[in-house]
Swiss-Prot record:
Component of the INO80 chromatin-remodeling complex. It catalyses: ATP + H2O = ADP + phosphate + H(+). A motif (DEAQ box) lies at residues 872-875. ATPase component of the INO80 complex which remodels chromatin by shifting nucleosomes and is involved in DNA repair. Residues 239-250, 258-276 have a biased composition (Basic and acidic residues). Residues 322-343, 1505-1514 have a biased composition (Polar residues). Its EC number is 3.6.4.-. GO terms for biological process: CENP-A containing chromatin assembly; DNA repair; positive regulation of transcription by RNA polymerase II; regulation of TOR signaling; subtelomeric heterochromatin formation; telomere maintenance via recombination; transcription by RNA polymerase II. This is Chromatin-remodeling ATPase INO80. The keyword Oxidoreductase does not apply. It comes from Lodderomyces elongisporus (strain ATCC 11503 / CBS 2605 / JCM 1781 / NBRC 1676 / NRRL YB-4239). The lineage of its organism: Eukaryota, Fungi, Dikarya, Ascomycota, Saccharomycotina.
Length: 1575
């Protein structure tokens, strides 16, 4: 049983007080009586106010026995000690403020009673600290020791101070031990009940382990004995082994006491069994320490002495208290340190102290004190930076003569106490007792020798430095002055009696009071636990009730608080954002306002600068126009009054002289308008003069100028001296020019005279080539300028130019510069000659070449000075960034003439490129030209915006001097009209699926990225690649619209042939006729052995018994047919059945074959209609003449029967005998071949295969034999069987299972081709000749197959045609009227060639550029055309082709505005088509494009009731035109087709023929519903 668990605070205090009371009473009885009875020593109370961490305050009492008083110092008003409590489980340190009250004075009047002073030494400073200074740190486990003041006061009231004096050191250690045990008991109970204070218990245990104080009193020993009684019964053999494994981490555990001996009746602690040598060494060390402590205690300095009531002071201290160390001090200050880990011994060696005499005591004591002081200073504690703490204790000492005996006893006790303090508890052996007696004797003698020194009233200082360490805690030693009256034996006996009494008391208490207290404590603990559990349950219930009530409110409160906080945060954030936005907006407005003002100023300045440049160009054009007279030649119908005003306005600036004409020096902000006009006029005059000077310098540098005469007067090659001319047609020109062509010749001649370049932009077909040739002949005839002339044309018109120059001007020598590199090298020798004169006898006059060749050989052309350069189809240099444009501009030419029928194809930039080519100095900035005209005109064409008429007039005024353009309707009255018709087609089922498949693969985001991302980047390669990908995507849609076979052709199908062909020798050995019949054989051969056939099969046939055996087993034998008597009723005898059984299948069919008058059509009508019509209904002969030929003659003649029924025969041949087979086998093979080496077998095989009867029946009857039957009037029923082989499959497949793709299906799978098929039939009937233009050469290949199938004669010209072939093809078309169709590619066959033999043009698919199509259609609509030209354009409804057509109309509008000055209104979608990529994206995203005919595309308003839209001027139709009536078919087949507005499928199906319905959905079964990858 653990006694500690039975003790509470009150019980521990009671036990302690009883123990001390009994001890004091026994000691008083044993002590010797004094001479004078001392006064009674009352215990002095010391109250302390303890403040816990919770703020509760309680009053506790400490007592001082005898006359020891802890009072205030003289220089201080009181000391407040702040006692630190241990920090447990992270709690803050609690401090107790102890206030010591002054004690009451005693009855002793002889000696002045002065209080004991408590002083604190901080570091090296030895002064007393004020009350506010930091109190000393004491043991934290002693801080909770409290004693009941009332109980303690009552007990000590009976104690006389002269009879008992309690040692302070012992009292301090006793209280500390009791407090430690009490604290440990609390921790154990708390950990046992609540299991939460384990940390405090472990900490207390660790403290006991570190200080070795867990057996310093008898309570520990009793507890250790009660824990385990078996620990004292350990055998001697296992004792040493178990001592090694002692666990010191648990001081009260049985492992810590196992193997240890207990000495009942003494104050020594538990110790291990040690050997004698070791005990001897420990005894010597203790004797040395005792001697040192005695010297230090007697060598104290004298101070204010205290009078003691008696000299017989008996110190009460435990024997051999471990950890007690006596150290000397230099003064009356004693160091008390509670932390043993911070005590450090002095490293300085201490000399052995010797006994000294009285005279030497003080000096030596002082020296020792000084040394010990230094050591103490070095042994400062490091905890918190605080110095050693010292307590000054003042003792009262009686006079020397009264108690000399007591002093002796005291000396002995003191010596004994020192010996016990230095000893380490040697054990209970006799040797140890003897050693202790020797030590006590020695100490007593030392005390006696030093007693005389301290006989006077002195103050002794006890240095109690309590420092806990591994070797033990340092206790405090009390040095007092005692007499040497008692001997060592008496002292020893006294202490033994004291120990025995102490042990007896404890045994009685443990046996009697222990169980009772234990039961009480258990009951109390259980009651407390029950109450605590109930309290916890009630508290939890109340807390839960309160929580239920307040949880919702807390949640709502927290939610509202967060929401309010969030709203406030958002409000201020929004407020700040609004303020920032307003501030930024205000700043932005200021910046924009300043920027706008600056832009307005700059705009005004640029406007004035632009107006200056335009005025300068106008004046330049006006000065040239006055000499060239373009208005008169062009023949425009403008108002003459407006022209007069404009000329008058511009004429006033003629001959002006401006002071400043440099554009960089002109101030456009301040100068007035008149000054700007004068400067512009001056610049225009200077530009004109410069142009004339350049032409003059070119003429002056000619090598053939006459040196004898004045060049300016006599040189006829300088036409600038001639002025305005009226030129007639040159005589050397072998043709007759029309009136407008002569005007054009005059305009060109005037341009040459003024040294100005020009553009001849007459409409295609008005003879630009003849006019340019005429101006060359004019220069040669009039001015003797024979060249050199350079003509650059496209490759397709090289031969045309060569032929026309040679034809119209035979005097010109034409050099055709084309061919291979070697050929061109030979041709270059004509102009490589030095000092070459170009006259009539020159090697060549005109050089004709192509754009590609001149770019490749530009270095050779730059060496020449060309008199005149003509560029045919000048739109080839429409890009000013191309190498072609730059190369041609670098040539040295006097004049340049550009021939083009379409100066503007796509945008105004192309017009600027041409103008810049002819006038590089005037039109030098494209940006300025774009600012002048391009933006407004192009935006007007696209978005139907207004156009400034004044700006348009100024544009025409600038362009007129440099460009001459006439249109056909104004100058050529005999030329027929040109009619353009758009034919709209629908997508077939296969085309719709292809179109939808492509449409599903388009991503709008990809298109947007392709049109925006790369356009903003500077990488041109990425830009080109994106454009190419978009164009390729559009091309796939166009291929679907043209024909689905452009993706994948229909395959030829045939069954798998399991056949092998016979091998033959060289074909050279064969004759002219190669017989390959029976060349194929089956892979399977049936081998028939010869012996089996000869001996078994063929031999039995010749035997007599074969017939009997055969007849016996034959089902056709008459004997076996007796049971079938009903056969005779059917008109057949058994013998006839027997004969039929011996025949094979063919023989039976031939015997049953008879001629009848009924035709196959009659049999079909008989089966399906039930009406059998007579042959007379199908006769072509007039019924009135039927008497001339008898019916019998018709019926008896097969030939006559066919002639009389031609319509029926034709119908049979076209429909009944041309139907495709309904089934195609998966595999085919010839019959299995029987292989036999017998001659009999081969003869029989040949007889069977080549039976004459069977062959004559299968083959048609010969005409001679049929004539013989007719002459003999043999009835038709008696004709021999013939022509039994069916003819329906023979006409289509020729007895073959190979299935070729159906051409009818090929035509009907494309909506365009089906429409073209109908159109060509109509055109051929009306004797038209057709030009068909294509964009894809692969589509031209498909068209050739179609024309071959339809047996139309055609020729073809595309980019792969050679130059010589092109010339021959054009010649054949013009001279051979039997050619019906001319297939051309738009780019190759649409330039420069004359195809006037055709009066119909068909565009199977349109070009991106509308001008390309215009040039292509003008190949037929040109001079020489006498018939009206009709242009058909095939367009697929609701597809990309319609949107391309709309875009082309916008470009045509730009041409009409610029060239003709017409600002007509067009309707189109507002799309930004500034670049080609955006044009392509517009085409892809413009409409639904699904081909469903739902009208959701761009042109949903196109007239769906009409397949043909006819217009002379291309204009889109606005809205839907309702036509409730019927429209006659334009194809002229005599039938009317009705098409309802609602587009219901029933009406559409009713309007189609059976063949169209049959072939329309065949694309669904082809297995190719998606385009092939990679196409």
């Amino acid at each position: 049983m653990n006694i500690l668990s039975m003790l509470s605070n009150d019980s521990a205090v009671q036990l302690q007080l009883q123990l001390q009371l009994q001890l004091q009473l026994q000691l008083n009885l044993q002590s010797a009586p004094s001479k004078a009875s001392p006064p009674t020593l009352l215990p002095k109370q010391t109250t302390a106010t303890t403040t816990n961490a919770t703020g509760n305050t309680k009053t506790v009492a400490r007592y001082s026995a005898g006359d020891i008083n802890i009072l205030n110092d003289e220089n201080s008003h009181g000391v407040d000690e702040s006692i630190d409590e241990p920090v447990t489980n992270g709690q803050a340190t609690n401090k107790e403020s102890v206030k010591q009250e002054p004690t009451q004075p005693t009855n002793n009047t002889e000696t002045e009673k002065k209080p004991l002073t408590l002083s604190i030494q901080n570091g090296a400073d030895k002064k007393s600290l004020p009350p506010q200074s930091q109190p000393p740190r004491i043991n934290p486990l002693v801080a909770d020791v409290t004693l009941s003041t009332s109980k303690f006061k009552n007990v000590l009231a009976h104690i006389q101070h002269d009879q008992l004096e309690i040692d302070l050191d012992y009292k301090f250690k006793f209280e500390s031990n009791v407090s430690l045990i009490d604290q440990l008991d609390k921790n154990q109970r708390l950990s046992q009940d609540l299991r939460i204070l384990k940390f405090d218990e472990v900490k207390s245990n660790n403290y006991l382990i570190s200080t070795h104080q867990f057996t310093t009193n008898y309570i520990d020993r009793v507890v250790a004995e009660d824990i385990s009684s078996r620990n004292n019964k350990i055998s001697d053999t296992n004792k040493n082994k178990e001592i090694i494994h002692i666990d010191h981490s648990k001081p009260l555990h049985h492992n810590s006491t196992r193997g240890k001996e207990y000495k009942w009746g003494s104050t020594r602690e538990i110790h291990k069994v040690e050997s004698k040598p070791k005990r001897k060494r420990n005894t010597e060390n203790s004797e040395t320490n005792n001697s040192r402590s005695t010297v230090s205690s007697k060598a104290s300095t004298p101070s204010k002495s205290l009078a003691f009531g008696s000299t017989h002071h008996v110190p009460i201290r435990p024997k051999g208290s471990k950890g007690t160390n006596l150290s000397s001090s230099s003064g009356p200050i004693t160091d008390i340190t509670n932390d043993s880990n911070n005590v450090r011994r002095s490293s300085r060696p201490k000399s052995k102290r010797k006994a000294y005499e009285d005279g030497e005591g003080e000096d030596n004591g002082n020296n020792i004190d000084s040394n010990s002081t230094d050591n103490n200073n070095r042994n400062k504690t490091q905890e918190g930076g605080r110095g050693p703490k010292r307590i000054r204790i003042k003792l009262k000492v009686k006079p020397e003569g009264e108690n000399e005996g007591e002093e002796k006893d005291e000396g002995k006790g003191k010596g004994r106490g020192k010996g016990k303090g230095k000893g380490k508890g040697k054990g209970k052996e006799k040797d140890g007792d003897k050693e202790e007696e020797d030590e006590n004797n020695a100490n007593g003698e030392n005390g006696k020798s030093k007693g005389s020194v301290s006989s006077s009233t002195t103050t002794t200082t006890t240095a109690a430095a309590a420092a806990a360490g591994g070797g033990g805690s340092t206790g405090s030693a009390l040095g007092t002055t005692t007499s040497n009256s008692s001997t060592s034996k008496e002292q020893k006996a006294f202490m033994r009696q004291y120990d025995n009494t102490y042990v007896a008391i404890w045994k009685d208490m443990s046996r009697k009071d222990g169980p009772k207290v234990s039961r009480l404590m258990q009951q109390s603990t259980q009651a407390k636990l029950i109450n605590l559990k109930k309290t916890c349950i009630l508290a939890a219930r109340e807390a839960k009730r309160w929580q239920v009530k307040n949880t919702k409110n807390q949640k709502d409160l927290s939610t509202k608080a967060r929401r309010a906080m969030r709203e406030m945060f958002n409000f201020w954030k929004r407020n700040e954002r609004i303020e920032r936005e307003l501030k930024k907006k205000h700043e932005k407005e200021l910046v924009e306002k300043a920027k706008r003002e600056e832009e307005e100023r700059e705009s005004k300045r640029q406007s004035r600068k632009l107006n200056f440049l335009i005025t300068q160009t106008e004046l330049y054009s006006h000065f040239i126009g006055k000499k060239i007279k373009t208005d008169e030649i062009e023949g425009t119908d403008a108002d003459p009054r407006i022209k007069a005003q404009e000329k008058a306005h511009l004429d006033k600036y003629a001959g002006v002289d401006a002071a400043n004409n440099d554009i960089l020096a002109i101030d456009f902000d301040n100068d007035d308008e008149d000054a700007l006009h004068r400067a512009a006029a001056q610049n225009a005059q200077n530009a004109l003069a410069n142009a004339q000077n350049q032409a003059k310098q070119f003429d002056d540098t000619e090598p053939f100028k006459n040196p004898d005469t004045n060049g300016e007067e006599m040189n006829f090659q300088n036409p600038t001296l001639l002025g305005d001319l009226s030129i007639e047609q040159p005589k050397m020109l072998k043709c007759t020019l029309k009136e407008y062509q002569i005007k054009g010749l005059n305009w060109l001649a005037n341009l040459y005279e003024q040294g100005i370049n020009g553009i001849l932009a007459d409409e295609m077909g008005l003879g630009k080539t003849v006019q340019s040739i005429s101006v060359l002949s004019y220069l040669a005839e009039t001015h003797n300028i024979w060249g050199p002339f350079l003509v650059v044309t496209p490759a397709s018109t090289l031969h045309n130019w060569q032929q026309e120059i040679s034809k119209f001007v035979p005097n010109f020598k034409v050099l055709p510069y084309w061919g291979h590199a070697k050929d061109r090298k030979v041709l270059r020798k004509f102009w490589d000659r030095k000092s070459l004169r170009y006259d009539k006898d020159a090697p060549f006059h005109v050089l004709v070449t192509s754009y590609q060749l001149i770019v490749s050989d530009i270095a050779y052309f730059q060496k020449m000075k060309w008199q005149y350069m003509i560029l045919d189809e000048a739109q080839a240099i429409k890009s000013s960034q191309s190498s072609r444009w730059k190369s041609l501009l670098s040539l040295s030419c006097r004049n340049r003439l550009l021939l083009t029928g379409t100066p503007i194809q796509n945008s105004m930039q192309e017009l600027w490129a041409l103008l810049h080519f002819i006038m590089p100095t005037l039109f030098d900035s494209h940006d300025e030209f774009s600012d002048w005209f391009s933006k407004d005109i192009e935006s007007h064409a696209q978005s139907n915006t207004g156009l400034d008429e004044q700006q348009l007039r100024r544009l025409h005024m600038i362009l007129k001097p440099f460009m001459l353009r006439r249109i056909k309707k104004n100058v050529q009255s005999e030329l027929g009209d040109k009619v353009e018709i758009d034919l709209f087609c629908d997508l077939t089922n296969r085309q719709k699926k292809y179109y939808q498949s492509l449409r599903s693969q388009i991503s709008i985001m990809d298109l947007i990225d392709a049109t925006t991302t790369n356009s903003s980047s500077n990488n041109s390669s990425l830009d080109d690649s994106s454009t190419t990908s978009l164009v390729n995507l559009v091309m796939q849609f166009r291929k679907v619209c043209n024909h689905p076979d452009l993706f994948e052709r229909a395959d030829v199908r045939s069954p798998m042939a399991l056949v092998k062909f016979a091998e033959t020798g060289s074909f050279l050995r064969e004759g002219n006729d190669l017989d390959v019949s029976y060349a194929s054989e089956n892979l399977i051969n049936y081998n028939l052995p010869r012996l089996i056939y000869d001996d078994l099969i063929s031999a039995n046939e010749n035997k007599n018994d074969f017939g009997s055996v055969y007849a016996k087993f034959s089902v056709y034998d008459p004997e076996n047919l007796r049971d079938l008597g009903w056969i005779s009723s059917a008109g057949t005898s058994p013998n006839e059945i027997q004969q039929l059984g011996k025949m094979n299948v063919l023989e039976r069919a031939i015997k049953l074959q008879r001629y009848t008058t009924g035709s196959p059509l009659d049999r079909i009508n008989y089966l399906y209609e039930g009406d059998y019509s007579s042959p007379n209904s199908k006769l072509l002969i007039n019924p009135q003449n039927q008497h001339m030929i008898s019916q019998q003659q018709i019926e008896n003649s097969s030939v006559l029967l066919d002639l009389c029924n031609i319509s029926q025969k034709v119908y049979e041949e076209m429909y009944l005998n041309t139907q495709d087979p309904a089934f195609t086998p998966l595999a085919s093979a010839p019959p299995i071949t029987i292989v036999c080496s017998s001659n009999n077998f081969q003869n029989k095989l040949q007889n069977e295969l080549f039976n004459p009867t069977i062959r004559s029946a299968l083959a048609p009857m010969s005409l001679n034999k049929e004539l013989e039957f007719m002459n003999n009037n043999t009835p038709l029923e008696l004709y021999p069987p013939s022509n039994m082989l069916p003819s329906s499959l023979s006409k289509v497949n020729d007895y073959s299972n190979i299935r070729m793709p159906s051409m009818d299906r090929f035509i009907t799978e494309s909506g365009k081709l089906a429409k073209l098929d109908e159109l060509l039939v109509k055109l051929k009937q009306e004797d038209h000749r057709v030009l068909i233009y294509f964009q894809m050469t692969k589509m031209m290949d498909l068209m050739e197959e179609y024309l071959t199938f339809k047996q139309h004669k055609y020729i073809r010209l595309d980019g792969s045609s050679k130059l010589d072939d092109r010339r021959d093809l054009v010649h054949d078309w013009q001279t051979k009227p039997e050619i019906f169709v001319f297939l051309l590619s738009t780019r190759a066959g649409g330039l420069g060639i004359n195809l006037t033999a055709a009066d119909t043009v068909v565009f199977y698919d349109s070009d991106w550029n509308p001008t390309i199509d215009s040039q292509a259609m003008d190949r037929a609509h040109r001079l020489g055309q006498t018939r009206q030209v009709t242009v058909y354009r095939l367009l697929t409804r609701n597809t990309i082709e319609e949107r391309m057509r709309d875009r082309a109309k916008q470009k045509e509008q730009v041409q009409q505005v610029v060239m003709e000055g017409k600002a007509t209104t067009i309707m189109s979608k507002k799309e930004d088509a500034a670049s080609k990529k955006k044009d392509v994206a517009f085409l892809l995203l413009g409409g639904s494009g699904d081909g469903d005919g739902d009208g959701t595309g761009v042109n949903s308003g196109v007239d769906t009731s009409n397949d043909v839209s006819k217009s002379t001027t291309p204009k889109p139709e606005v809205g839907k035109k309702k036509n409730n009536g019927n429209k006659k078919n334009v194809f002229g087949n005599g039938k009317k087709r009705v098409r309802e507005e609602d587009g219901e499928e029933e009406d559409a199906l009713n309007s189609k023929r059976l063949q169209e319905l049959y072939h329309e959905g065949e694309g669904e079964f082809s297995g190719t519903v998606t385009p092939a990858p990679g196409v």
